[in-house]
């Protein structure tokens, strides 16, 4: 342990990382640099600075960075261009924040000359994988300290006891009723784990939810919302141009007011176990619905289907911590290329937990052609007779398979009606132009042909005999 002289700690000021800070000082006897990221979690971050100072951290070794714009612009928006959802439900609010934190940890290591990084992820979770894969991808030789894989403080109760023993200030409001929820928040979502949520059959308490009202208590009047997209990203809300992080903050506010974005799920962790978590993702829920709506009129069918095929793989890469991997980067290039035409406006209606698409339009890139799609007279824009051949060609393999199945089952196979012989049309002679000479000739009476005289047979003469 003595070879580590300085470590950069991902520090939130909460229970886990406050205990880790003291533990690093006691066990590793090293200099600690703290990094606290402002990801839009909605908490005052200055208390984290005060806690770090109280723990003996030098002011120059305390980093508190506002990374909200970078987070949404370079991580959340690229992920939503892919319509990313993990296992059909989870919008990856925690997962997508980890690669940015790992990136900033390595940058601070390079700035301060630190030997290692340290994180507060448990040995059971996904975050340990995400932090460390990111760190190794960006700085292959970096050392990593993961206290949960080293110490004997294996429960939140033991953490609180350690904190009390060493005079570490923590929120103790749940002390009598049990451990507090394990929560993680950023501009995209807030998550809840632990306590009675460890029973997947138990309903979450209403008092747990922080960002959204219950749909039952949401306003009785719907609210309309216009989102403008440019190359797959929202750039304006109700006609007002906004920065990326401002867009998501506003959508969180509007969605929370209407009870949008609550989620209770059991997910499959990368380490192999199932885990129950509750999430509030109001802005992300609105963003996903709107993005799919604008793509519905601006993306070619096969391109859209290809994106849908690739999305689960992309989601797994993000969830499992492979944001900085070559395969995720390659997929991103493809996805971003598809977004060049994803421009336009989507109109939504927010009502009691629902995001309802009521309109979508692109003045420059819409592939929706009403002259072809109409149920009225299309003036020949689409020849419906063409559909017959299209259907027969696409049915060919189905008919062949059905015939084969019939033969195997011993059923008579319907014979195809014999085709009628095709007669070749005799080409009509092309009429020659009538000349004056021909016309005059036509006016003269036609002379009757002379009757052919009968041909007389030749008379044979007798052959004279020779004298003896």
From Swiss-Prot:
<dbReference type="InterPro" id="IPR048268">
    <property type="entry name" value="Arginosuc_syn_C"/>
</dbReference>
<feature type="binding site">
    <location>
        <position position="126"/>
    </location>
    <ligand>
        <name>L-aspartate</name>
    </ligand>
</feature>
<feature type="binding site">
    <location>
        <position position="267"/>
    </location>
    <ligand>
        <name>L-citrulline</name>
    </ligand>
</feature>
<comment type="similarity">
    <text>Belongs to the argininosuccinate synthase family. Type 1 subfamily.</text>
</comment>
<dbReference type="GO" id="GO:0006526">
    <property type="term" value="P:L-arginine biosynthetic process"/>
</dbReference>
<dbReference type="GO" id="GO:0005737">
    <property type="term" value="C:cytoplasm"/>
</dbReference>
<feature type="binding site">
    <location>
        <begin position="10"/>
        <end position="18"/>
    </location>
    <ligand>
        <name>ATP</name>
    </ligand>
</feature>
<dbReference type="GO" id="GO:0000053">
    <property type="term" value="P:argininosuccinate metabolic process"/>
</dbReference>
<feature type="binding site">
    <location>
        <position position="182"/>
    </location>
    <ligand>
        <name>L-citrulline</name>
    </ligand>
</feature>
<dbReference type="Pfam" id="PF00764">
    <property type="entry name" value="Arginosuc_synth"/>
</dbReference>
<feature type="binding site">
    <location>
        <position position="120"/>
    </location>
    <ligand>
        <name>ATP</name>
    </ligand>
</feature>
<feature type="binding site">
    <location>
        <position position="90"/>
    </location>
    <ligand>
        <name>L-citrulline</name>
    </ligand>
</feature>
<protein>
    <recommendedName>
        <fullName>Argininosuccinate synthase</fullName>
        <ecNumber>6.3.4.5</ecNumber>
    </recommendedName>
</protein>
<feature type="binding site">
    <location>
        <position position="279"/>
    </location>
    <ligand>
        <name>L-citrulline</name>
    </ligand>
</feature>
<feature type="binding site">
    <location>
        <position position="127"/>
    </location>
    <ligand>
        <name>L-aspartate</name>
    </ligand>
</feature>
<feature type="binding site">
    <location>
        <position position="191"/>
    </location>
    <ligand>
        <name>L-citrulline</name>
    </ligand>
</feature>
<dbReference type="InterPro" id="IPR018223">
    <property type="entry name" value="Arginosuc_synth_CS"/>
</dbReference>
<feature type="binding site">
    <location>
        <position position="130"/>
    </location>
    <ligand>
        <name>L-citrulline</name>
    </ligand>
</feature>
<dbReference type="InterPro" id="IPR048267">
    <property type="entry name" value="Arginosuc_syn_N"/>
</dbReference>
<dbReference type="GO" id="GO:0005524">
    <property type="term" value="F:ATP binding"/>
</dbReference>
<dbReference type="Pfam" id="PF20979">
    <property type="entry name" value="Arginosuc_syn_C"/>
</dbReference>
<keyword id="KW-0055">Arginine biosynthesis</keyword>
<feature type="region of interest" description="Disordered">
    <location>
        <begin position="445"/>
        <end position="468"/>
    </location>
</feature>
<keyword id="KW-0028">Amino-acid biosynthesis</keyword>
<dbReference type="InterPro" id="IPR024074">
    <property type="entry name" value="AS_cat/multimer_dom_body"/>
</dbReference>
<keyword id="KW-0067">ATP-binding</keyword>
<keyword id="KW-0547">Nucleotide-binding</keyword>
<dbReference type="GO" id="GO:0000050">
    <property type="term" value="P:urea cycle"/>
</dbReference>
<comment type="subunit">
    <text>Homotetramer.</text>
</comment>
<dbReference type="InterPro" id="IPR001518">
    <property type="entry name" value="Arginosuc_synth"/>
</dbReference>
<feature type="compositionally biased region" description="Basic residues">
    <location>
        <begin position="458"/>
        <end position="468"/>
    </location>
</feature>
<feature type="binding site">
    <location>
        <position position="37"/>
    </location>
    <ligand>
        <name>ATP</name>
    </ligand>
</feature>
<dbReference type="InterPro" id="IPR023434">
    <property type="entry name" value="Arginosuc_synth_type_1_subfam"/>
</dbReference>
<feature type="binding site">
    <location>
        <position position="95"/>
    </location>
    <ligand>
        <name>L-citrulline</name>
    </ligand>
</feature>
<dbReference type="InterPro" id="IPR014729">
    <property type="entry name" value="Rossmann-like_a/b/a_fold"/>
</dbReference>
<feature type="binding site">
    <location>
        <position position="126"/>
    </location>
    <ligand>
        <name>L-citrulline</name>
    </ligand>
</feature>
<feature type="compositionally biased region" description="Low complexity">
    <location>
        <begin position="445"/>
        <end position="457"/>
    </location>
</feature>
<dbReference type="GO" id="GO:0004055">
    <property type="term" value="F:argininosuccinate synthase activity"/>
</dbReference>
<keyword id="KW-0963">Cytoplasm</keyword>
<comment type="pathway">
    <text>Amino-acid biosynthesis; L-arginine biosynthesis; L-arginine from L-ornithine and carbamoyl phosphate: step 2/3.</text>
</comment>
<keyword id="KW-0436">Ligase</keyword>
<feature type="binding site">
    <location>
        <position position="122"/>
    </location>
    <ligand>
        <name>L-aspartate</name>
    </ligand>
</feature>
